[in-house]
Amino acid sequence: MTNAPVFGADVLARVADTLETRLPQNGGDPQTSYAAKLLAKGPDAFLKKIGEEATELVMAAKDGRPERIVSETADLWFHCLVTLAHYNLRPEDVLAELARREGLSGLEEKARRPAD
């Protein structure tokens, strides 16, 4: 769908860097930043947005509309990055986990998880 190369890890890291500046303890201003507003409200606010965006992604995928799928995925990922920032995590943590799982079958990976 895109013609230009996008370096995903770089983009994710830059967004994460920006989100860190939006954290309340780093002076994020809820009056001037949507992310700062979500972060100031706390987990209930951004977790609700994750649920909404996930539902919108499901609907876009059911409709088979590639441009909407990409747009809704971007919205979902953004709100996931907000969540990571709140918990002092980085996209690199998620990428490392994906790399760890790479090459494993999903069933094998699931079997290796500790029981809850």
From Swiss-Prot:
Entry's localization field: Cytoplasm
UniProt-listed CDD domains: NTP-PPase_HisIE_like
Coiled coil location: none
GO biological process entries: L-histidine biosynthetic process
Superkingdom assignment: Bacteria
Any single Pfam family the record assigns to this protein: PRA-PH
Major location (coarse): cytoplasm
Primary enzyme class: hydrolase
A GO cellular-component term linked to this record: cytoplasm
UniProt-listed Enzyme Commission number(s): 3.6.1.31
Pathway: Amino-acid biosynthesis; L-histidine biosynthesis; L-histidine from 5-phospho-alpha-D-ribose 1-diphosphate: step 2/9
Catalysed reaction equations from the record: 1-(5-phospho-beta-D-ribosyl)-ATP + H2O = 1-(5-phospho-beta-D-ribosyl)-5'-AMP + diphosphate + H(+)
GO terms of molecular function: ATP binding; phosphoribosyl-ATP diphosphatase activity
Family statement drawn from the similarity comment of this UniProt entry: Belongs to the PRA-PH family.
PANTHER family recorded: HISTIDINE BIOSYNTHESIS BIFUNCTIONAL PROTEIN, HISTIDINE BIOSYNTHESIS BIFUNCTIONAL PROTEIN HISIE
Cited NCBIfam families: histidine_hisI (TIGR03188), PRK00400.1-3 (NF001611)
Protein name, UniProt field: Phosphoribosyl-ATP pyrophosphatase
Record lineage: Bacteria, Pseudomonadati, Pseudomonadota, Betaproteobacteria, Burkholderiales
